Amino acid sequence: MASEKSKILVVGGTGYLGRHVVAASARLGHPTSALVRDTAPSDPAKAALLKSFQDAGVTLLKGDLYDQASLVSAVKGADVVISVLGSMQIADQSRLVDAIKEAGNVKRFFPSEFGLDVDRTGIVEPAKSILGAKVGIRRATEAAGIPYTYAVAGFFAGFGLPKVGQVLAPGPPADKAVVLGDGDTKAVFVEEGDIATYTVLAADDPRAENKVLYIKPPANTLSHNELLSLWEKKTGKTFRREYVPEEAVLKQIQESPIPLNIILAIGHAAFVRGEQTGFEIDPAKGVDASELYPDVKYTTVDEYLNRFL
């Protein structure tokens, strides 16, 4: 007899990635709850999203990250807590850690990660300070003795691929493409729904407990030059490539306003430093989602780019 699926609570479920996590949890058969501040919002788009959750069998729990009683109550009904809170609330996840510790019943916690592996990044400021908050939540989780999985996913496809890998461009290249570094460093692009699927699959998997879950599908690991060549093949056009050396990238980061400097710093970490791919996974600390779940039919970069033709 198959073991019963864990009850999953999603915090931040109405956000950009969170809605995918809620949908994946319900689709994969988990009793799923979403913590929401308002179960009947006046905003039509938010109301439609919540209705789609309910139609999928998701329970809406009225609560707030800043209301500890409601937070503890929500956590007590869950086996697994997945946080998908945005960058402005990363540090405030300490409240969630406290609630999980107080409730005492959670078997796995996924803090809001889904980008670079914050324990091994050399990313420059101002992004360094933002990722530092994620490091703090990791240490707080471990100190509290809470079983965890840290999901690391590289670039969201919805951010990186519409511009064909260009960091600051408004859209696909028209006549030229701006490339950070030499363009040969490999990066990872993952469709948001696939990030959610791999994350939820790991929720009940003992192999992912107290490990970093690296989500880097093989067909979606490619350099900026390879990405541009793929786009050229699809469009039948050739684009002039303007390569920006690292020194110029660092200077641009220092001189650009927020949020452009943060976006550039992340691009520098991925495309110049190779932080999404330039390492071997230490099996004592991490697992490869593609190896754990080889049957997942993920959206390839090749397929994703067809949306823009």
From Swiss-Prot:
Active site, per annotation: 134
Alphabetical GO biological process terms: alkaloid metabolic process; cellular response to sulfur starvation
GO molecular function terms attached to this record: NADPH binding; oxidoreductase activity
Pfam families hit by this protein: NmrA
EC class (word): oxidoreductase
Gene Ontology, cellular component aspect: cytoplasm
Pathway linked to the protein: Alkaloid biosynthesis
Induction: By sulfur deprivation.
Annotated localization: Cytoplasm
EC number of this enzyme: 1.3.1.-
Keyword Nuclease listed: no
Main location: cytoplasm
Residues where NADP(+) binds: 12-18, 37, 46, 138
Keyword field: Alkaloid metabolism, Cytoplasm, NADP, Oxidoreductase, Stress response
Source domain of life: Eukaryota
Matches recorded under CDD domains: PCBER_SDR_a
Protein purpose: Reductase that may be involved in a late step of alkaloid biosynthesis.
Quaternary data: Monomer.
UniProt family annotation: Belongs to the NmrA-type oxidoreductase family. Isoflavone reductase subfamily.
This protein's name: Isoflavone reductase homolog IRL
